[in-house]
């Protein structure tokens, strides 16, 4: 509803570059759920987390200072509980070799299969603030299929109609719409997530320096969406 009231200022005690878990917690406060995950600090904790989330999991470096984890050896996928302990030790060594820093924390995440991958971000330029929306994952790297939704200057909310129209402008829209016998993606849940992300951008205003989810997993119709990776940088200032 374009006549919805402007979002109230939101207290955001964190500032600086948030780690992935903190960024997802921030996004979840506004209505964008994340994948199931557990933060760990040791191989033994990682094994226990993998047993809870398995049968196969993702292991990631957890750091607010290193945002591009894969470039320093900080991501491993498709691990079993038996594999994750040794893999964590190797990851810690790789990160230290690449960065000179000691890796102190890691995330163990559930594996999500059969989902479309979307990128969702905040884009700022002289015209104002916009929501960046497009296909994520490998598709994003290959064809850069994105569109921008400019947020209203008067603080009015985006509408579901605007978001769905933007999705339909993507060249890869058919991948969400049952292309060649694929399951139709949960587009209503994706629209809700985009609206929630926009509310966050409006509520935090200029304090939100950067925010991105890539990928946001869009599961088959009725199964919702999950943020799998997240970046957020919060500036200092009044909340």
Predicted features and spans:
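ATP-dependent carboxylate/acyl-activation modules
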Residues: 1-239
């Amino acid at each position: 509803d374009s006549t919805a009231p402007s979002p109230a200022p939101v207290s955001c005690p964190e500032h600086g570059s948030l780690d992935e878990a903190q960024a997802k917690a921030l996004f979840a406060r506004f209505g964008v759920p994340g994948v199931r995950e557990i933060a760990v600090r040791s191989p033994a904790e990682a094994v226990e987390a993998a047993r809870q989330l398995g049968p196969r999991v993702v292991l990631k470096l957890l750091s607010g200072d290193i945002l591009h984890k894969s470039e320093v050896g900080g991501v491993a996928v498709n691990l079993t509980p038996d594999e994750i302990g040794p893999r964590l030790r190797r990851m810690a060594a790789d990160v230290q070799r690449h960065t000179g820093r000691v890796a102190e924390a890691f995330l163990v995440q559930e594996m999500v299969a059969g989902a479309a991958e979307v990128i969702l971000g905040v884009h700022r330029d002289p015209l104002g603030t916009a929501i960046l929306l497009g296909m994520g994952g490998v598709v994003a790297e290959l064809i850069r299929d994105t569109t921008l939704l400019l947020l209203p200057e008067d603080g009015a909310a985006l509408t579901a109609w605007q978001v769905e129209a933007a999705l339909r402008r993507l060249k890869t829209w058919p991948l969400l719409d049952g292309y060649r016998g694929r399951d139709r993606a949960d587009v209503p849940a994706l629209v809700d997530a985009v609206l929630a992300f926009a509310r966050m951008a409006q509520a935090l205003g200029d304090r939100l320096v950067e925010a991105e989810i890539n990928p946001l997993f869009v599961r088959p119709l009725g199964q919702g969406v999950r943020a799998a990776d997240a970046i957020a940088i919060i500036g200092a200032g009044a909340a």
